[in-house]
Regions:
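Sensory/regulatory domains in signal-transduction proteins
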Residues: 2-28, 33-141
Length: 141
């Protein structure tokens, strides 16, 4: 797997569980799982703290999928579903989101960002010959 662009942090048990699930989806010698192997029901008890992000390239744009946990939107203060990351204010819990997402996509590896009050894990997922989606999860500190 590629080197991590962000320093590894000890993960909260909830984030460890999401990462373990993500790793369980990896097929054979691939570095990342395919996005269509993801089953939201596998993380149903964590649905409030999980999100999917669609990745578009040329130009790179990130769109919050229809799966964005209620706790995430509550912390942000408004709905972000179906919105592009460059259309929202980069405030908690989306501080440095675009930078972290870019690093996740380029490295094709998990990244962790920690800020006051939360830790965010982004995990790349493959499709159409590139990282086309990311699974995100939050732990509230």
């Amino acid at each position: 797997m590629s080197s991590q662009p962000f320093p590894a942090l000890p993960l909260d048990p909830k984030l460890q569980r999401v990462e373990r699930y993500w790793r369980s989806l990896i097929r054979g010698a691939n570095d990342t799982p395919f996005w269509d192997d993801f089953a939201p029901s596998a993380l149903a008890d964590m649905e409030e703290d999980v999100m999917l992000v669609d990745v578009f390239d040329k130009p790179l744009r990130l769109r919050f999928n229809t799966i964005v946990g209620a706790a995430i939107e509550a912390r942000y203060g408004t709905a972000v579903r179906d919105r592009f990351s460059d259309e929202i204010e980069p405030s908690s819990p989306f501080e440095y989101f675009n930078a972290q997402a870019s690093a996740t996509i380029e490295a094709r590896a998990p990244t962790v960002h920690q800020a006051a009050g939360y830790r965010r894990l982004l995990l790349p997922m493959w499709g159409d010959g590139r990282v086309s989606m990311m699974l995100g999860a939050f732990a509230w500190l």
